[in-house]
């Protein structure tokens, strides 16, 4: 139920009011969610001199109170005491996080995974490209669309690096800071940069994609940016990034299995996706360690940050993705990923479950406030709730007997794919 409607309900009951079903109310975004706002004509009151506008005013007061409370909590994460926790962690980052970066000389490069004329020579390069195109021809369009979504996500790296540099106490303020935090961000970004490069290069060589349209999608996504909520809080930023690193590792790993020897036989693409997935797992380990350390140092604030991020749902950073035509493209991409098996609701649930176990959330007790205990319990119970929601959604879909629709995707020369939208 919409937040404002929930807040207004107890007061409405006391005044013997009921919703006016003949009236509609606009919706807007509140605290990161779509919320139905109550207009003065939304409620009909009997046996009371109180008007609908009074109820609307009371609901607005409740919303304002919630907003003030939430703003105050977010400000607490930027207090000197909280930021000092991150500052004090720097020697630990030097010892336990920076070693997860590989030396440049030992790191793979895109040319290691795809045909390289410097190694193969002219004729060998052309022969290798012909073989790559032959294998790529067997990959179905559904997986190609999911591959574009994965690649566009990786190519929006400038957005992610700038977001991390805005995080208090850890950002690279000069662009060349010598702190352990700043060196981690730059090193992580340098390794991530290869992911979009190698996927882009494969797609170009395969001949299966309209690269101009794909490149425009990347351009649009970087231009649109990414609103981080809450902004600048290191606690929330690291929870989000830990989740995202595992999610991308899962998506690339699933893609590798689906297109590989046991799937559609594209060994080159399977190798590319598998290599990227391994990188993402290593990066996930870094961010997971950071959150674990925060939970040790400040368990109450840490677990409340985890709960806040999960309550809102951890959306993929490609949510503003656009092909310049469809307003619902992201919903289509999410549904296609579910159909293809590259990233599913079950994957999301498994990620939550894994992180809850990795961070030993269930064991948190000492130092927790009442709110902290409620946050802990919410996080621990969430995987089961997600599974129940998935089951109910499936039951509703079966009852509704919805049929998939066929839509053209300009990334693959407007070939049609079937998608089942919610």
From Swiss-Prot:
E.C. number(s) listed in UniProt: 1.14.19.-
Entry binding sites for Fe cation 1: 154, 192, 195, 280
GO MF term set: metal ion binding; stearoyl-[ACP] desaturase activity
Superkingdom, taxonomy of origin: Eukaryota
Cofactor descriptive note: Binds 2 Fe(2+) ions per subunit.
Cofactor(s) of this protein: Fe(2+)
CDD domains: Acyl_ACP_Desat
A cellular-component GO term for this protein: chloroplast stroma
Residues noted as binding Fe cation 2 in the record, renumbered to the chain: 192, 245, 280, 283
Family: Belongs to the fatty acid desaturase type 2 family.
Protein name (Swiss-Prot/TrEMBL): Acyl-[acyl-carrier-protein] desaturase 6, chloroplastic
Lineage of the species this protein comes from: Eukaryota, Viridiplantae, Streptophyta, Embryophyta, Tracheophyta
């Amino acid at each position: 139920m919409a937040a404002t409607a929930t807040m207004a309900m107890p007061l409405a009951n006391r005044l013997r009011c009921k919703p006016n079903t003949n009236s509609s109310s606009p919706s807007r975004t509140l605290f990161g969610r779509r919320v139905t706002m109550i207009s003065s004509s939304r409620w009909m009151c009997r046996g009371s001199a109180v008007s609908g506008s009074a109820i609307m005013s009371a609901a607005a007061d409740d919303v304002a109170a919630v907003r003030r409370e939430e703003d105050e909590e977010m400000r607490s994460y930027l207090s000197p005491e909280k930021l000092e926790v991150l500052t004090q962690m720097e020697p630990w980052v030097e010892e336990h996080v920076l070693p997860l970066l590989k030396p440049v000389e030992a790191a793979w490069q895109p040319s290691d995974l795809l045909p390289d004329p410097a190694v193969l020579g002219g004729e060998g390069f052309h022969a290798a490209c012909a073989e790559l195109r032959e294998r790529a021809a067997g990959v179905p369009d559904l997986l190609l669309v999911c591959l574009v979504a994965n690649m566009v996500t990786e190519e929006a790296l400038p957005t992610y690096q700038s977001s991390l540099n805005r995080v208090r106490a850890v950002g690279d303020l000069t662009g060349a800071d010598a702190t352990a935090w700043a060196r981690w961000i730059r090193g992580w970004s340098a390794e991530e940069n290869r992911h979009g490069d190698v996927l882009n290069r494969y797609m170009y060589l395969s001949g299966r994609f309209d690269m101009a349209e794909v490149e425009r999608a990347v351009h649009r996504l970087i231009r649109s940016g990414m609103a981080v909520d809450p902004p600048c809080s290191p606690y929330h930023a690291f929870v989000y990034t830990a989740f995202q690193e595992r999610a991308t590792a899962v998506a690339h790993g699933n893609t590798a299995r689906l297109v590989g020897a046991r799937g559609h036989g594209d060994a080159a693409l399977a190798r590319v996706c598998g290599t990227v997935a391994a990188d993402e797992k290593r990066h996930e380990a870094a961010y997971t360690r950071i959150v674990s350390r925060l939970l040790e140092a400040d368990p109450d604030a840490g677990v409340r940050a985890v709960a806040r991020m999960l309550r809102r749902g951890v959306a993929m950073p490609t949510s503003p993705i656009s092909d310049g035509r469809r307003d619902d493209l992201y919903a289509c991409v999410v549904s296609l990923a579910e159909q293809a098996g590259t990233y599913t609701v079950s994957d999301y649930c498994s990620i939550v479950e894994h992180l809850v176990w990795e961070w030993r959330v269930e064991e948190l007790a000492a130092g927790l406030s009442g709110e902290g205990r409620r946050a802990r319990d919410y996080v621990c119970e969430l995987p089961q709730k997600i599974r129940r929601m998935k089951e109910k959604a499936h039951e509703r879909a079966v009852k509704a007997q919805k049929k998939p629709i066929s839509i053209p995707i300009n990334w693959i020369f407007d070939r049609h794919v079937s998608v089942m939208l919610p």
